[in-house]
Amino acid sequence: MKGNAKVIESLNEILTMELSGINQYFIHSKLCESWGFERLADKIREESLSEMKHAEQVIDRILHLEGVPNVQRLDKIKIGEKVSEQLKADLDLEVAAISRFNKAIALAVEVGDNGSREMLAAMLTSEEAHLHWLDSQLELIKQIGESNYLAQQVHKPE
């Protein structure tokens, strides 16, 4: 099915963001793991894997629309040197992602590409949930202090 060129480019922008998220979340997960924050590392790794599933869906959609997925392009990866910096960098990435998703959804609606719209809307819900989680973690750090927050992140939940 030949897709709209603007939608394909928009999907490639989403793909760039998802691939960047995979890398940023993965390195943050590995850093947390190396610092002994296993519980937090597991949660961040889950987010990296979620982004990978999103990237796969976007690639499949681009191919369905007879486009070429651009897997070579990445946004700048922001690596936090401490947990609060990581969470803030990830929050910034999610805010940008939500903006891109909303623009891509609006374009899909405009050109009548309901398949892309539906896929993007489902992904947007996931991105919004991640944003809420990040916001909550940063608020916890603010309220109880980073050392108390990190003490809760040492062991995996049973």
Regions found by a protein language model. Give the residues of each.
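Iron-associated oxidoreductase/ferritin-like identity signal
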Residues: 1-158
